């Protein structure tokens, strides 16, 4: 079983989503199925078929989240330190061409949200900077071509 690295915050978010699916969504869809059944003939009952489809989706989501949580390797970022970039680090970069600053935290795949400054450990930018240190310049293959970034800061927040 392959372990899935994730931050404690990512694990907590998965746990909250799982609880919501089990305590809110699952009972609601069961009630919707019961309501649709009460309307009689199920062969032409669109409400029933829609509710059953939704139930299948919810059960799939629950199974997927439970699998991720079972395989989770939770990494407590607050206990990490050092200048070398690794999973969980928050890294400040400067684009060598445009002088634009960027700040990203390296997180697990399901936690990634570029707009919130979280990039997947498997993303091109993360793969390029992992193992590097403050002051290093890295080249990243982007859809727009190769870009050079200087690592200006490594934080553990």
UniProtKB/Swiss-Prot annotation:
Pfam families: GreA_GreB, GreA_GreB_N. GO terms for biological process: DNA-templated transcription elongation; regulation of DNA-templated transcription elongation. Keywords: DNA-binding, Transcription, Transcription regulation. GO terms for molecular function: DNA binding; RNA polymerase binding. It comes from the Bacteria. The keyword DNA-binding applies. InterPro entries: GreA/GreB_C_sf, TF_GreA/GreB_CS, Tscrpt_elong_fac_GreA, Tscrpt_elong_fac_GreA/B, Tscrpt_elong_fac_GreA/B_C, Tscrpt_elong_fac_GreA/B_fam, Tscrpt_elong_fac_GreA/B_N, Tscrpt_elong_fac_GreA/B_N_sf. SUPFAM superfamilies: FKBP-like, GreA transcript cleavage protein, N-terminal domain. Transmembrane segments: none annotated. Belongs to the GreA/GreB family. Necessary for efficient RNA polymerase transcription elongation past template-encoded arresting sites. The arresting sites in DNA have the property of trapping a certain fraction of elongating RNA polymerases that pass through, resulting in locked ternary complexes. Cleavage of the nascent transcript by cleavage factors such as GreA or GreB allows the resumption of elongation from the new 3'terminus. GreA releases sequences of 2 to 3 nucleotides. This is Transcription elongation factor GreA. The lineage of its organism: Bacteria, Pseudomonadati, Pseudomonadota, Alphaproteobacteria, Caulobacterales.
């Amino acid at each position: 079983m392959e372990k899935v690295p994730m931050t404690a915050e990512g694990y907590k978010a998965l746990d909250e989503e799982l609880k919501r699916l089990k305590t809110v969504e699952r009972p609601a869809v069961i009630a919707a199925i019961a309501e649709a059944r009460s309307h009689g003939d199920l062969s032409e009952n669109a409400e029933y078929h829609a509710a059953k489809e939704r139930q299948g989706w919810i059960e799939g989501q629950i199974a997927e989240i439970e699998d991720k949580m079972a395989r989770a390797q939770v990494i407590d970022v607050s206990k990490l330190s050092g200048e070398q970039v690794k999973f969980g680090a928050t890294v400040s970069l400067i684009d060598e061409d445009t002088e634009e600053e960027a700040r990203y935290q390296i997180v697990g795949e399901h936690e990634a949200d570029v707009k919130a400054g979280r990039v997947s450990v498997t993303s091109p930018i993360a793969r390029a900077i992992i193992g590097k240190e403050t002051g290093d310049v890295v080249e990243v293959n982007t859809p727009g071509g190769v870009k050079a970034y200087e690592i200006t800061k490594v934080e553990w927040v």
